[in-house]
Amino acid sequence: MVHFFDSDIAKKYGVNAAVLACFLWDCIEQKSTESPQLHEGKVWLRCSVQMMTGFFPFLSYDETRYALKRLVKGRVLTKGRFNEIRFDRTNWYAFTEFGQFLMAESEGRTQ
């Protein structure tokens, strides 16, 4: 499988975070056209760290968790929990306005 990332995002947040940001952006864009999960006016993606390590076998659980933490701390992503079952602690991710700007800018450079 081929993975892409934006070098400007990688410089600021790290290569792992840039790879995850592009993956999440693609998933959320696809979801927004198929069956959007809307909460708080944003399209959210429910995805556990364990699930992401399945898509990225070259990243460990901790590397994935740390990369997501950097994106949340850098205000590229926001994290929430909208699970129907209370004890389900799977996180949901959405791009902030700043994150949407970064990803749209990234797409503009690649086209």
Regions found by a protein language model. Name each.
Residues M1-G54, E97-Q100:
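Short recognition helix of helix-turn-helix/winged-helix DNA-binding domains
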Residues G14-V15, K79, A104-G108:
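Long, compositionally biased, intrinsically disordered segments
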Residues I28-N91:
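Winged helix-turn-helix DNA-binding recognition segment
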Residues K69, T96-Q111:
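Charged low-complexity intrinsically disordered patches
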